[in-house]
Structures are given as C-alpha cells and as structure tokens.
C-alpha cells in the first residue's frame, strides 16, 4: 500500500508517517519502480503501536525502547513491565505538577475583582509580580 492508504487505514497523516520514519520509529518502506513508498501490514501494526503509545503520553525514547524489546523479545516481559513502571512514575510526577499549576491559577483568579478596571486587574498584576518558577514542567517538553 502507498503512504496515503496507510494514512487512511491508521487514521494518521502522511506527515506523521514520514516523521516516524525519519525518527527511526517506523522502518523505511521499500520503494516501487516509480519511487513510491510501499508499506505492508507490518508497517500498519507498528504505526498503530506507536500511535497507541503516544496516546498514553509515552515519549519517543520510551516507544523506541519498547520497539527494541518487541523486535528482540527476552525470555519474559519484565523489561517491558519495568518501562511501564517508569512511565507510570513520570505520569505521577506530571499529575503533581498539574495540581500545583492549578493551585497557582486558582490563587491568581482569587486576585480578580470583576468590577475593577483592567489597570487594576489582580490577575494581570499577579502575573507581573509572582515569582517565576524555574522548574520545568514536564508537560511542556
């Protein structure tokens, strides 16, 4: 199948498919005599796997590690389980960061008196004066 057909069956854009190829997550397909990419069912399964991992907020490196394990399976799936544990820890960290972010936003919102003119807006003043948190939020990566 050509790239457009693969995109259609996987509900993915052709740009995303090319991106996954360039990043090494999706193997490069063979090409026909007209130099069109020719994909097979293995590409379809792998692309669905990648997209499912991305829907679980897994990074490309996590997906790459899972693909390596999938391509060269060990005697058991303990390595896969370990990777999933690591990802769960990342999700827990992100949840805590989001809770802290929500608390900051709620605090800012409490500074607002709706009847104030914009020059006296507590939210805008708070955004100008609050301490900048140097901590990088994982959801911005």
Question: PLM ranges: what are they?
Answer:
Residues 64-74, 78:
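Short, charged, low-complexity amphipathic alpha-helix
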Residues 1-68:
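Basic helix-turn-helix/winged-helix DNA-binding cores
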Residues 51-54, 70, 87, 112:
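Alpha-helix boundary/capping residues
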Residues 23-24, 33, 70, 112, ...:
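The DNA-recognition helices of helix-turn-helix-type DNA-binding domains
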Residues 75-141:
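C-terminal regulatory/oligomerization modules of transcriptional regulators
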Residues 2, 8-11, 22, 72, ...:
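Context-gated lysine
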Residues 33, 57, 71-74, 92-95:
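Residues at alpha-helix boundaries and short interhelical turns
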């Amino acid at each position: 199948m050509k790239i457009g057909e693969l995109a259609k069956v996987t509900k993915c854009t052709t740009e995303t498919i090319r991106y996954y190829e360039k990043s090494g997550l999706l193997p490069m397909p063979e090409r026909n005599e007209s130099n069109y990419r020719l994909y097979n069912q293995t590409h379809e399964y792998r692309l669905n796997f990648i997209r499912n991992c991305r829907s679980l907020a897994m990074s490309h490196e996590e997906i790459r590690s899972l693909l390596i394990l999938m391509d060269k399976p060990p005697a058991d799936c303990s390595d896969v389980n370990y990777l999933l544990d690591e990802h769960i820890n990342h999700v827990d960290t992100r949840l805590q960061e989001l809770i802290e972010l929500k608390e900051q936003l709620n605090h800012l919102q409490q500074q607002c008196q709706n009847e104030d003119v914009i020059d006296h807006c507590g939210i805008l003043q708070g955004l100008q004066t609050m301490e900048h948190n140097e901590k990088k939020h994982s959801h911005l990566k």
